[in-house]
Amino acid sequence: MAVLVLLFCLVTFPSCVLSQVQLKQSGPGLVQPSQSLSITCTVSGFSLTSYGVHWVRQPPGKGLEWLGVIWSGGSTDYNAAFISRLSISKDNSKSQVFFKMNSLQADDTAIYYCAK
């Protein structure tokens, strides 16, 4: 019975969910080889001055691959395999994080995600 009540609560009143943290991405969808991929991640429910935002990707049929992170203070860490062509920055006042990967190759085909 408790499970049904929780399910009803989640479906009927989304505000029952413990956290209203949201990360919404916007980008071009498809990018041609040799071009750059730029994605904006707009966050709500938390402050970029308090939490870092990570970027990961999932190639078709494979697991998640960590690409990099921008920390609350603005410093960044990158996967060594991408450090020469990856840039992550942010605008705290707009609650936005920016991801840019240059010189795309066929094996960069993946779904890209931002994550808290």
From Swiss-Prot:
Stated name of the protein: Immunoglobulin heavy variable 2-4
Signal peptide range in chain numbering: 1-19
One Pfam family of this chain: V-set
Residues in Ig-like domain copies: 20-116
GO biological process: adaptive immune response
PANTHER family: IMMUNOGLOBULIN HEAVY CHAIN
Gene: Ighv2-4
InterPro entries linked to this entry: Ig-like_dom, Ig-like_dom_sf, Ig-like_fold, Ig_V-set, IgHV
Cysteine pairings via disulfide bonds: C41-C114
A GO-annotated cellular component: immunoglobulin complex
Alphabetical UniProt keywords: Adaptive immunity, Disulfide bond, Immunity, Immunoglobulin, Immunoglobulin domain, Signal
Keyword Transit peptide (UniProt): no
